[in-house]
Amino acid sequence: EAGYPNGENFPVLEFYLTFNNDIPMFEAVQNMWKVNLGIDIKLTQMEFAPFINKFRTERDYTMAGTSWTGSYNDPTTFLGMFVSYSYKNHSLFTNKAFDDEILLASKTIDQNIRMPALHRAEKILIEDEAVIIPIYYYEPPVLKSPKLKDVFYIPFAQYKFSYSYLEK
């Protein structure tokens, strides 16, 4: 529909990833894009230091596999990286409507205003502009007794037991 029926004459896209990334997952994505879109992707593995240089400094890439761990329990820990003026905006994404929604959310504590604004920003980022393609989120493996109550997981694989108790 976009000028490349069945992916014909679509340029091969290069997808950069480090040796530490989950190679089988990216190979599965490569296969899905080929089967469903007719698009060829070349996977290029790099050592971490050159990858970071290409990704953050040179910004010489079309697609790259990266990850981010939220520092706090709020959507802005992820969405805030993509405002046009953020030093973390490695994609160089710029969208005034997105920036405006994030700004609106940052100016209030009223969740009835914040959350709809953040949902609109997320829609712009992922659905409308397709700047990022979230593939998965990490869920650490945990063995926990059903009797242990009120344990809270916080970012960076830490657990808060301050209010925990054992049910009899």
Locations of regions flagged by a protein language model:
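Extracytoplasmic/secreted proteins, especially bacterial periplasmic and envelope-associated proteins
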Residues: P24-A28, M32, P50, D74-T77, ...
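Short, structured coil/loop segments at alpha-helix boundaries
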Residues: F19-I23, N95-K96, D110-R114, S145
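Short, charge-rich amphipathic alpha-helical segments embedded
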Residues: D128-V131
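N-terminal cationic-hydrophobic initiation segments that often serve targeting/anchoring roles
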Residues: K34, R56, S106, L125-I126
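Short, solvent-exposed loop/beta-turn-alpha elements that line the ligand-binding surface or hinge
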Residues: Y4-F10, K54-R59, G80-K107, Y137-K168
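Ligand/substrate-recognition segments at binding pockets and active sites
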Residues: E1-G70, Q111, Y137-P140
